[in-house]
UniProtKB/Swiss-Prot annotation:
The chain crosses the membrane at residues 282-304. It is found in: Cell membrane. This is T cell receptor beta chain MC.7.G5. Disulfide-linked heterodimer with TRAV38-2DV8*01J31*01C*01 alpha chain. The alpha-beta TR associates with the transmembrane signaling CD3 coreceptor proteins to form the TR-CD3 (TCR). The assembly of alpha-beta TR heterodimers with CD3 occurs in the endoplasmic reticulum where a single alpha-beta TR heterodimer associates with one CD3D-CD3E heterodimer, one CD3G-CD3E heterodimer and one CD247 homodimer forming a stable octameric structure. CD3D-CD3E and CD3G-CD3E heterodimers preferentially associate with TR alpha and TR beta chains (via TM domain), respectively. Gene3D superfamilies: Immunoglobulins (2.60.40.10). GO terms for biological process: cell surface receptor signaling pathway; detection of tumor cell; T cell mediated cytotoxicity directed against tumor cell target. Residues 145-254 form the Ig-like C1-type domain. GO terms for cellular component: alpha-beta T cell receptor complex; plasma membrane. Residues 122-136 are annotated as: T cell receptor beta joining 2-3. Its main location: membrane. The keyword Mitochondrion does not apply. Keywords: Cell membrane, Disulfide bond, Glycoprotein, Immunity, Membrane, Receptor, Signal, Transmembrane, Transmembrane helix. InterPro entries: Ig-like_dom (IPR007110), Ig-like_dom_sf (IPR036179), Ig-like_fold (IPR013783), Ig_C1-set (IPR003597), Ig_sub (IPR003599), Ig_V-set (IPR013106), TCR_beta_variable (IPR050413).
Length: 315
């Protein structure tokens, strides 16, 4: 089974059902080298006394690593962690790693809840969006994605009167990406289906690069309009400008990588031919306009000459 086929077919689901509220986490994605000190920020605006930090590895359940019942109260959770936390203010609960290691690679989720009892963890917890942390021994393994858009098949269009564009992002590491579709300059969500998670291109390798596929389905009529523009945009979260880089290729910093397609009419009338037609029509119009102007000048000259002759004959 090919890598691209795996990307088309793969679906990966997280088991945790999380409630998002006014919980803010920064950064959303972070890739760093071994030994760096990092702080993951978490804040909430609901005035909750209880706050929590969880760690979740891919495909695994949440593990509580730290919690707090209020200002200056911090406790360790049920999972041994080399991180530390502080609670100087009610709304603020940062988590710090003094010396990051590859084993710290994971997703870190911050949550809060109302205080209804110190010993109970059954209160409704509100979660932030999470921070995806990747710690690497060598930053040369970081690669941005290559992105391609594949046009709909004629068979689908003729049988269903629908058109599905496929976007494929390949060759990126780590899996810190967000994919979106844009039509005529505006982001769209209707008709979009994106894989829940990126897939490893070589599942047997720990440092395998990733791929991600997404589909945008529109009506055949909409696709067959050459004026419609489709763009697949992949936001890649890579290195920062401050990270040291000694490789002979471009530094894989945080960046946007895109691919695009134009609508294609069913009679072979492509966006290129449409634009060429518009250009030809514009030139023809200018030629005709020029001829009309020249004709008007000639007519005016003839009228003037006739008036002069008439005046001379009267004289």
């Amino acid at each position: 089974m090919t890598i691209r086929l795996l990307c088309y077919m793969g679906f990966y689901f997280l088991g945790a059902g999380l409630m998002e509220a006014d919980i803010y986490q920064t950064p959303r994605y972070l890739v760093i080298g071994t030994g760096k000190k990092i702080t993951l920020e978490c804040s909430q605006t609901m005035g909750h006394d209880k706050m929590y930090w969880y760690q979740q590895d891919p495909g695994m359940e949440l593990h509580l690593i730290h919690y707090s019942y209020g200002v200056n109260s911090t406790e360790k959770g049920d999972l041994s962690s080399e991180s530390t936390v502080s609670r100087i203010r009610t709304e603020h609960f940062p988590l710090t790693l003094e010396s990051a290691r590859p084993s710290h690679t994971s997703q870190y989720l911050c949550a809060s809840s109302e205080a209804r009892g110190l010993a109970e963890f059954t209160d409704t917890q509100y979660f932030g969006p999470g921070t995806r942390l990747t710690v690497l021994e060598d930053l040369k393994n970081v690669f941005p994605p290559e992105v391609a858009v594949f046009e709909p098949s004629e068979a689908e269009i003729s049988h269903t009167q629908k058109a599905t564009l496929v976007c494929l992002a390949t060759g990126f590491y780590p899996d810190h990406v967000e994919l979106s579709w844009w039509v005529n300059g505006k982001e769209v969500h209707s008709g979009v289906s994106t894989d829940p998670q990126p897939l490893k291109e070589q599942p047997a390798l720990n440092d395998s690069r990733y791929c991600l596929s997404s589909r945008l389905r529109v009506s055949a009529t909409f696709w067959q309009n050459p004026r419609n523009h489709f763009r697949c945009q992949v936001q890649f979260y890579g290195l920062s400008e401050n990270d040291e880089w000694t490789q002979d290729r471009a530094k894989p910093v945080t960046q946007i990588v895109s691919a695009e397609a134009w609508g294609r009419a069913d009679c072979g009338f492509t966006s290129e031919s449409y634009q060429q037609g518009v250009l030809s029509a514009t030139i023809l119009y200018e030629i005709l306009l020029g001829k009309a102007t020249l004709y008007a000048v000639l007519v005016s000259a003839l009228v003037l000459m006739a008036m002069v002759k008439r005046k001379d004959s009267r004289g």
